[in-house]
C-alpha cells in the first residue's frame, strides 16, 4: 500500500510509517507472522498522530484543509447519496467544473446537493480551476437552488474553495454580481439549506453558496474572509507572515463557533478526514440528517426569518475593555 503523503508537522511519523510499510512488505513476501509487531507500531503511530492533531495551530489546520487526499464534494456525495444525477450548465452558455451540483437521495428523501470541487492532481485541478468557481458556476448553483425551491427539496451545500476565481474574464462576466445575486436569493428560498465547510472556506467564493439555515464545519476545516497569505501580503507586505495572519483571522471551527458564525463543528478522525474518509462521510451524513430533521419541523416563513436573523447577528464588535469591566463587576 502506498504511503499517504505526510504534511510538514507530521514528519515525526515518517520513521514509524516506514517501519510499518517494511513489515507489511515482509508479510507479503514471506510466511513470517508479524501481526503483533505491526499492531504495536500502528497503535504507536495512531497515538502520536492523535497527539499531534490535538494541538494544531491555525496555520497547520490550513495545511490539513488543503490536503490533496481530503474528501471532496463528489467523494462525500458518492459515500452517502443514492441515485445521484449531476446537472450541468447555467443556461447562459457556461458549465463550470469548479462548482458541481445535482439531484440525489439520502435515505428516503430527495435533495439537491451542490459544492465546490477540486482535483486530485495537477491535471484535474486545472480542469476544476483549483475549486475556484466562475460566475457561471454560481449561476448554475442558483439555478439548482431555485429548482429545489420550486419542488420543495432541501439543499445541501459543500464549501471547499480558496475563493472565487478572480481572473479578468470572470470579472468581465460579472463575478461580483453573480455572488451578490446568490446571497440575495438564498435568503428568499423556502426550503431548508444546510452548508458544510469540508475543506477551505475562502472569502466571497465560499459565501456564494453559504447562506444557510445551518452552517456546519469539520474540525480541521477553515473559514475566512481572505486567505492568510493574502492577508499577510496586504497588512505586512510579507506573505511569510501567513501563520500570524491565520491566528489573527480566527479561522478555526472553535473560534467561529464562539463567534456564532458556525452552528456545529464536526469531529474528524485522528489524522484528519484524509486518513479515514468513510468515517468522515458517516459523521457528515449523521449531522446532515439530524439538522435537516429539525429544520423540516419549521414552516417556510419561519425558516426564512431565522436565516435572516442569523446573518444579521454576525459581525458584532466586542470591546475588550468593556468586557473586562463587566466580568469584574
UniProtKB/Swiss-Prot annotation:
Alphabetical GO biological process terms: fatty acid biosynthetic process; malonyl-CoA biosynthetic process
Keyword Transport set for record: no
Pfam families membership: ACCA
EC primary class: transferase
GO MF annotation: an example: carboxyl- or carbamoyltransferase activity
Classification via Gene3D superfamilies: 2-enoyl-CoA Hydratase, Chain A, domain 1
Gene Ontology cellular-component annotations: acetyl-CoA carboxylase complex
Highest taxon listed in the record's lineage: Bacteria
Catalytic reaction equation(s): N(6)-carboxybiotinyl-L-lysyl-[protein] + acetyl-CoA = N(6)-biotinyl-L-lysyl-[protein] + malonyl-CoA
Entry keywords, A to Z: ATP-binding, Cytoplasm, Fatty acid biosynthesis, Fatty acid metabolism, Lipid biosynthesis, Lipid metabolism, Nucleotide-binding, Transferase
CoA carboxyltransferase C-terminal domain: residues covered: 40-294
Places the protein is found: Cytoplasm
PROSITE patterns: COA_CT_CTER
Location, primary (coarse class): cytoplasm
InterPro entries: Acetyl_CoA_COase_a_su, ClpP/crotonase-like_dom_sf, COA_CT_C
The EC number(s) this enzyme carries: 2.1.3.15
Pathway terms, separated by semicolons: Lipid metabolism; malonyl-CoA biosynthesis; malonyl-CoA from acetyl-CoA: step 1/1
Free-text function comment from the UniProt entry: Component of the acetyl coenzyme A carboxylase (ACC) complex. First, biotin carboxylase catalyzes the carboxylation of biotin on its carrier protein (BCCP) and then the CO(2) group is transferred by the carboxyltransferase to acetyl-CoA to form malonyl-CoA.
Family recorded in the similarity comment: Belongs to the AccA family.
Protein's recorded name: Acetyl-coenzyme A carboxylase carboxyl transferase subunit alpha
Organism: Synechococcus sp. (strain CC9311)
Amino acid at each position: 500500500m502506498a504511503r499517504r503523503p505526510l504534511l510538514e508537522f507530521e514528519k515525526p511519523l515518517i520513521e514509524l510509517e516506514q517501519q510499518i510499510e517494511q513489515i507489511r512488505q515482509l508479510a507479503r513476501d514471506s510466511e513470517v507472522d508479524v501481526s503483533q509487531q505491526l499492531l504495536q507500531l500502528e497503535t504507536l503511530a495512531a497515538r502520536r498522530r492523535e497527539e499531534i492533531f490535538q494541538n494544531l495551530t491555525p496555520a497547520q489546520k490550513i495545511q490539513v484543509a488543503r490536503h490533496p487526499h481530503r474528501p471532496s464534494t463528489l467523494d462525500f456525495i458518492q459515500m452517502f447519496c443514492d441515485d445521484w444525477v449531476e446537472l450541468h450548465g447555467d443556461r447562459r452558455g457556461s458549465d463550470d467544473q469548479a462548482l458541481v451540483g445535482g439531484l440525489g437521495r439520502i435515505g428516503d428523501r430527495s435533495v439537491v446537493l451542490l459544492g465546490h470541487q477540486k482535483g486530485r492532481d495537477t491535471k484535474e485541478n486545472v480542469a476544476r480551476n483549483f475549486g475556484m468557481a466562475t460566475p457561471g458556476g454560481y449561476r448554475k448553483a442558483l439555478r439548482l437552488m431555485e429548482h429545489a425551491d420550486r419542488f420543495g427539496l432541501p439543499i445541501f451545500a459543500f464549501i471547499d474553495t480558496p475563493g472565487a476565481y478572480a481572473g479578468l474574464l470572470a470579472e468581465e462576466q460579472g463575478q461580483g454580481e453573480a455572488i451578490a445575486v446568490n446571497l440575495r436569493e438564498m435568503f428568499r428560498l423556502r426550503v431548508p439549506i444546510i452548508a458544510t465547510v469540508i475543506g477551505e472556506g475562502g472569502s466571497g467564493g465560499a459565501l456564494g453558496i453559504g447562506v444557510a439555515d445551518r452552517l456546519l464545519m469539520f474540525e480541521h476545516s477553515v473559514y475566512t474572509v481572505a486567505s492568510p497569505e493574502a492577508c499577510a501580503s496586504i497588512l505586512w507586505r510579507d506573505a511569510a507572515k501567513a501563520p500570524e495572519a491565520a491566528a489573527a483571522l480566527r479561522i478555526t471551527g472553535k473560534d467561529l463557533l464562539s463567534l456564532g458564525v458556525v452552528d456545529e463543528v464536526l469531529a474528524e478522525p485522528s489524522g484528519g478526514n484524509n486518513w479515514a474518509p468513510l468515517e468522515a462521510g458517516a459523521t457528515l451524513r449523521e449531522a446532515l440528517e439530524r439538522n435537516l430533521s429539525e429544520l423540516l419541523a419549521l414552516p417556510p416563513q419561519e425558516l426564512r426569518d431565522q436565516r435572516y436573523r442569523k446573518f444579521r447577528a454576525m459581525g458584532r464588535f466586542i470591546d475588550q475593555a468593556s468586557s473586562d469591566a463587566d466580568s469584574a463587576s
